[in-house]
Amino acid sequence: MSEGITDIEESQIQTNYDKVVYKFDDMELDENLLRGVFGYGFEEPSAIQQRAIMPIIEGHDVLAQAQSGTGKTGTFSIAALQRIDTSVKAPQALMLAPTRELALQIQKVVMALAFHMDIKVHACIGGTSFVEDAEGLRDAQIVVGTPGRVFDNIQRRRFRTDKIKMFILDEADEMLSSGFKEQIYQIFTLLPPTTQVVLLSATMPNDVLEVTTKFMRNPVRILVKKDELTLEGIKQFYVNVEEEEYKYECLTDLYDSISVTQAVIFCNTRRKVEELTTKLRNDKFTVSAIYSDLPQQERDTIMKEFRSGSSRILISTDLLARGIDVQQVSLVINYDLPANKENYIHRIGRGGRFGRKGVAINFVTNEDVGAMRELEKFYSTQIEELPSDIATLLN
C-alpha cells in the first residue's frame, strides 16, 4: 500500500519529488524521439514535463495532478515512447482516456511524436469494428483506448497484455466518476504484476486516491498548478493577409501606421525567426531574435537588451511564450498562429499580465481561418478584424 496517500486532502496532493529538467536535450531521449518532439512544436518542456517525464522514464509509479492545457499528454507520450522496445511487436504501453475523442487526440499526439520511430499506435475505441481492433492490436506497441472497449478486447483475447509494462490513466478523476471504475479495476488485474502505473488527474477525489492506494507502489507525487493566465484586458484582432507571402508587407504597413515602443512577434519556426529578423534589420528596424537553440547566456543578454529598451522588436518562437515576463510590452503579433492551441494564451498573455492592457494582432492566411475559429472556441473569446484606427488602440 502506498504510504501517506490516504491522508492527502481531496483538493490537492503533496509533491514528494523535486527534480526538474529544464530542457528536452538533457533528458537523454532517443535521437529519433527528440526529432519528433521538436518537429511537433515543443521547444522547452512545460512545468509538468520538466518534472514528470524523467520519473516515468525511470520506471517509477507516478501520480501527477495538473489541469488540461499544461502539457500532460506530451508528458506521458514522450515518456512512454522512450520506454518502448521497438524490436518487440506487441502492446507494451496501455493508455486509457474517458472518451473516444480524447483517446483519438492522444493517439494523434503519440503518432506525431513517434514520426521518426518504428512504433505503431492503435486506438481501441467504440465505433470501430472488432476486426480492425484484432488487426491493430496484433503488432501495436502502444494502445490508446476507452476502458469499456479495452476490457472487451482483453476478455475476447484479442488484446494480449503479457508484454504490457506501462499503464497510463489520463483524466482519471473524470474516468472514475463516469462509471468506469469497475472496468478499470478489472483491467488492472489482467496486467502483469510488475506494470508501472502513471495516473494523471486535475482533481484528487476519493475515487482516485483509492486507485492509487490499491495499485501504485510508492508513487512519485507531482502537483503542478496551472498558470493563472487570462485574456481579460487584451484586445485581440486579426488581419487576413490571404497568403503567406503577404505577411511581411502587412507587418511593415502596420509599423508605418502605428507608433509602438516595443512589441513581441511570434513565429512557429527558428528559420522563420531568422528570415524575419534579417528582413527587418535590412529595413532598419532594431530587432532582437530568440529561440531555444541559443545558449542560455546569449538568451539572457538578448532579454536584458530588450527589457532595457535598446531593441524595439523581439522576435521569438514559443520559447518565450512561457515563463519570461516582459511587462512593458503592449503589442504582441502572432506572425504565425501557434501550432498548439495552449500556446496562444501564453503568447498573448505577455502584454496583459500584471493588470496591464495589451493588444494582440494575429496574421491569418486563408488557410488559417479555421484554426483561428478553433482558438475562439477553445478560449470562449472573440478575435475581431483589425480596425483602421489601430493607432488609437495602442496609445
Curated annotation (Swiss-Prot):
E.C. number: 3.6.4.13
UniProt motif (DEAD box) ranges: 170-173
GO cellular component terms attached to this protein's record: cytoplasm; cytoplasmic stress granule; eukaryotic translation initiation factor 4F complex; plasma membrane; ribosome
GO BP annotation list: cytoplasmic translational initiation; positive regulation of formation of translation preinitiation complex; regulation of translational initiation; translational initiation
Keyword tags: Acetylation, ATP-binding, Cytoplasm, Helicase, Hydrolase, Initiation factor, Nucleotide-binding, Phosphoprotein, Protein biosynthesis, RNA-binding
Top-level taxonomic group: Eukaryota
UniProt motif Q motif: location: 22-50
Residues the record lists as Phosphothreonine modifications: T73, T146
Domain Helicase C-terminal: 233-394
N-acetylserine carried by residues: S2
Effect upon mutating F24A: Lethal in vivo and reduces ATP binding and ATPase activity in vitro
Main location per the UniProt record: cytoplasm
Reaction(s) catalysed by this chain's protein: ATP + H2O = ADP + phosphate + H(+)
Enzyme class: hydrolase
SMART domains: DEXDc (SM00487), HELICc (SM00490)
Effect seen on changing Q49E: Increases about 3-fold ATP binding but reduces about 2-fold ATPase activity in vitro
Family as reported in the entry's similarity comment: Belongs to the DEAD box helicase family. eIF4A subfamily.
Entry remark concerning the domains of this protein: The Q motif is unique to and characteristic of the DEAD box family of RNA helicases and controls ATP binding and hydrolysis.
Subunit structure: Component of the eIF4F complex, which composition varies with external and internal environmental conditions. It is composed of at least eIF4A (TIF1/TIF2), eIF4E (TIF45) and eIF4G (TIF4631 or TIF4632). Interacts with eIF4G1/TIF4631 and eIF4G2/TIF4632.
Additional remark text: TIF1 and TIF2 code for the same protein.
Role this protein plays: ATP-dependent RNA helicase which is a subunit of the eIF4F complex involved in cap recognition and is required for mRNA binding to ribosome. In the current model of translation initiation, eIF4A unwinds RNA secondary structures in the 5'-UTR of mRNAs which is necessary to allow efficient binding of the small ribosomal subunit, and subsequent scanning for the initiator codon.
Protein name in the entry: ATP-dependent RNA helicase eIF4A
Lineage: Eukaryota, Fungi, Dikarya, Ascomycota, Saccharomycotina
Gene this protein is translated from: TIF1
